[in-house]
Structure formats: structure tokens, C-alpha cells
Amino acid sequence: MKCVLSILLFFAVLLIACEKPAGPGGKAVIKGKVYAKNFDSYGYTLISEYYIGGENVYISYGSDNAVRNNVKTSDDGSFEFLYLNKGHYRIFVESRDTSIHVKNSKKTIAVVTELDINSVNQTVTLSDFVINK
């Protein structure tokens, strides 16, 4: 009887130990696009808007808010984070803070989306990130 319990306990621990945390190493994908609104130097007047290439998109995961990786958007504003495990993720992009109307203000804010990947092969397509430039 002790032998059977020991074997069951061993397999239970083995299954728990095999659970992969959020982050790289899986087959899931997070993708989306970044849309920019270009304002005048004071942040009042909208000059143009477009999907922006070359913009940094950041990812953090699990209970940690530290940036774990980043990618740049393609010319059409699209981005992808590939090969992710199941877990909790935060995707964010920096945006100019247009609530401050000072000429050429460099103050930025983070535009953040949080999500969970619940299956191994899941692909999550996010709503567009809208940022101010």
C-alpha cells in the first residue's frame, strides 16, 4: 500500500513540476497592430494618423511587471510575440502624454493590455493599440 501511495505521490509531483510558467518556450502567439495619431508640438491639433512601423512593443508576464522582451512593429504596424506558454501577459506601448500641453513635451504614458493564454496553441489577436506621437 505504501508503495502505491509513493508512486502516486511521485507522479503528482512530476506533473506539477512539468507545468511551464508564462513566458517563452510554448506554441502560443500574441499579435496586434499599433496605430499612431500624430499631434502638433503642443499636443492640441491632430496632424495625421496611420499604422506605425518601427515602434517598440513590450511584453511582461507572470506576476512580474519587468519587461521581458520587446519587438518592433512592421511597416504596417503589426507585431507578434511567438512561442509563448500558457499564462498571464501584459503587452504595452509607449505613447506621448497629450494631457500636458507644453511645446515638445517628452512625457510618455504606457498603453497596456493584459490577457491570459489558456491553451497551448492559442493565437490571441489584440485590439489596435492607439498611441499619440
Task: Please report, for each region that a protein language model flagged, where it lies by residue.
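Short amphipathic beta-strand segments in non-cytosolic proteins
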Residues: 48-70
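Short, surface-exposed beta-strand/beta-hairpin micro-motifs centered on an aromatic residue
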Residues: 74-83
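C-terminal motif of bacterial Sec signal peptides marking the signal peptidase cleavage site
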Residues: 14-17
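A short tyrosine-centered beta-strand micro-motif
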Residues: 87-93
